[in-house]
């Protein structure tokens, strides 16, 4: 049984969503720490910057927790004062996605364990395969994804995996926290973005970072985006001659399988991806 300390550095959670997440997590066998007081704050942030930062520091400093679990995404991670590197790397595991892509990049760079997967409030909506995938990732066990590609029997060797929300990754450009994409499988997903915004974010990443040197780009779900968003993204990636796969079970829907930043992965000629765990 895994114990999670809860934190919030982004937007506040609606009471019904919070309650549903708590009930789902407890029913799945997780032990949970206390909910930070600032989670109910009004406005677009779950409390002021210091209150949100304190919730993260408390979660990371816990000696009883197996991992620190973000309650919700939204916005706020990038403006939250972060704890020292010793808390980020001291054997800590951090779980979240969406706005938390920012924190995952920092935790990974500091030597901590960054897991891209459901936040607490989205865990209530996660399908059973996604819940099993989260347990497997937390345990460091291998997982398999079936991807699709139009590259025929394209097969690439093992490489580490990173990625997350496209819009958030684009905002990391020009900061000390922007990850190195070269030689990695990079997983991208997004939610509620118009075609031109997706185009702009990806184009900016390709021109202003080393994303064009990625081992390959793996596209997840583009939820609540206009129809045709995923094919558009695939065309944009292929225009840069970067190997591309689609239909990764990652995103803002019921299907959101966890992956660990930096874990090794390989893809065979049939599009089966093996994430080897860590």
Regions of interest found by a model, annotated:
Residues 1-64:
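ATP/NTP phosphate-donor binding region
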Residues 177-229:
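Internal helical hairpin/lid segments
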Residues 73-89, 232:
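Short Gly/Thr/Asp-enriched flexible loops that form oxyanion-binding sites at enzyme active sites
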Residues 67-78, 97:
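N-terminal glycine-rich "phosphate-gripper" loop used for MgATP/nucleotide binding
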Residues 84-106, 113-120, 241-245:
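Short, acidic/small-residue loops that bind anionic groups at enzyme active sites
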Residues 221-278:
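ATP/nucleoside-binding phosphotransfer catalytic cores, i.e., glycine-rich phosphate-binding loops
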Residues 112-174:
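Conserved anion/nucleotide-ligand pocket segment
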Residues 13, 17, 160-193:
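Conserved beta-alpha junction segments in alpha/beta enzyme cores
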């Amino acid at each position: 049984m895994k114990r999670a300390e809860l934190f919030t550095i982004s937007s506040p959670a609606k009471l019904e969503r919070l309650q549903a997440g708590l009930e789902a997590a407890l029913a799945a066998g997780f032990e949970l720490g206390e909910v930070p007081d600032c989670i109910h704050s009004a406005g677009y942030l779950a409390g002021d910057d210091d209150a949100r930062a304190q919730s993260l520091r408390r979660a990371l400093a816990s000696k009883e927790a197996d991992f620190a679990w973000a309650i919700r995404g939204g916005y706020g991670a990038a403006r939250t004062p972060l704890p020292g590197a010793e808390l980020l790397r001291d054997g800590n595991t951090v779980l979240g996605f969406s706005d938390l892509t920012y924190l995952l990049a920092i935790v990974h760079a500091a030597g901590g364990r960054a897991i891209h997967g459901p936040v607490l409030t989205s865990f209530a909506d996660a399908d059973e395969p996604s819940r099993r995938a989260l347990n497997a990732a937390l345990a460091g066990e291998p997982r398999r994804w079936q991807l699709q590609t139009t590259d025929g029997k394209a097969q690439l060797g093992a490489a580490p995996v990173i990625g997350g929300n496209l819009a958030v990754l684009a905002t990391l450009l020009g900061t000390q926290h922007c990850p190195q994409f070269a030689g990695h499988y990079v997983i991208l997903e997004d939610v509620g973005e118009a075609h031109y915004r997706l185009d702009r974010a990806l184009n900016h990443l390709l021109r202003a970072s080393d994303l064009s040197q990625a081992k390959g780009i793996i596209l997840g779900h583009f939820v609540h985006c206009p129809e045709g968003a995923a094919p558009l993204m695939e065309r944009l990636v292929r225009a840069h001659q970067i190997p591309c796969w689609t239909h990764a079970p990652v995103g803002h829907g019921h299907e959101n399988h966890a992956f660990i930043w930096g874990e090794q992965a390989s893809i065979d000629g049939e599009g089966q991806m093996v994430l080897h765990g860590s």
